[in-house]
A protein has these predicted regions:
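Conserved catalytic core of the tyrosine transesterase superfamily
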Residues: 1-286
Length: 286
């Protein structure tokens, strides 16, 4: 089974061009399932049946895993077996008809516009690092992209004259406008800073760390948290909260749901509708 999982993740990464975080999520879920099956004496993926999968689901529930986690694991196993079916390695999908637990979608946490502006004001210095950080924060809030998408951007994905970025995988590509403020910060970074920070001239990554290598997810998390502390913001700010705030503020200012859905890259508009509910709730509270 381990080799089958390796083949599946290679397929996701190399053929489907799935985001690295998606690949890692599938890998983590399937390795957990593989360990459970090995402990049950089943090491061959072709010998797994529906009862085995249900036993694993019960085990996750016994461990008090969240409904969303259980659903994601079932979906991972189902996708894995769809891959094996296409390869002719199995004839049936043991997770095909297993019902996903109902998951209540929680209202996302958002920052007020005042706190977002306060955060964006923090990198105000002229040092290379602060100019870069300003560009990253402005771009993240101006576009609502995911942190994995932010750090995956290449120089070729940025079009400053036409004020947009090209974002996403080949299968789910989208063009997102960046706005004047983010454009100004990016122009300053590109003109004055980036060439001093990259370690090799052929570096394609738009944003690099202080060693000149592509910025990492963990590196950017540290950056955003340091500026939140500097701003005196008590909320536990994450890059995703800026994404939530971007969406909620757009809707609050009259943007239509379909446009916001396209910018965020949501496949289902019901996900985007959550932000409208947050905005409505805020109006009621006011």
């Amino acid at each position: 089974m381990e080799q089958c999982i390796a083949d599946f993740t290679a397929y996701l990464r190399n053929e489907k061009k799935s985001p690295e975080n998606t690949v890692l999520s599938y890998s983590r879920d399937l390795k957990g399932f593989c360990r459970f099956m090995q402990e049950a004496g089943v090491s061959d993926a072709a010998k797994v049946n529906r009862t085995n999968v249900m036993a694993y689901v019960y085990e996750l529930q016994k461990q008090k895993k969240a409904g969303a986690t259980v659903s994601r694991n079932i979906a991972s196993i189902r996708s894995f077996y769809q891959f094996l079916q296409k390869k002719g390695m199995v004839t049936e999908n043991p997770a095909a008809d297993i019902e996903l637990p109902k998951v209540e979608k929680k209202a996302p946490e958002i920052l007020s516009l005042e706190k977002v502006e306060l955060l964006l004001e923090q990198p105000r210095g002229e040092e290379d690092k602060e100019v870069r950080d300003k560009a990253m924060l402005e771009l993240l809030y101006a576009t609502g992209i995911r942190v994995t998408e932010l750090i995956s951007l290449k120089v070729s994905d940025l079009n400053l004259p036409l004020e947009y970025i090209h974002c996403g995988s080949e299968a789910k590509s989208r063009i997102i406008p960046i706005g004047a403020q983010a454009k100004a910060s990016l122009h300053k970074y590109m003109e004055r800073v980036r060439e001093h920070m990259i370690s090799v001239p052929e570096e394609e990554a738009l944003f690099v760390n202080c060693n000149g290598r592509p910025m990492t997810r963990q590196g950017f998390w540290k950056i955003i948290k340091s500026y939140a502390r500097r701003a005196g913001i008590e909320e536990d700010i994450t890059p995703h909260i800026l994404r939530h705030s971007f969406a909620a503020h757009l809707i609050e200012n009259g943007a239509d749901l379909r446009s916001v859905q396209e910018m965020l890259g949501h496949s289902d508009i019901s996900t985007t509708q959550i932000y409208a509910k947050v905005t409505d709730r805020k109006v009621d509270e006011d």
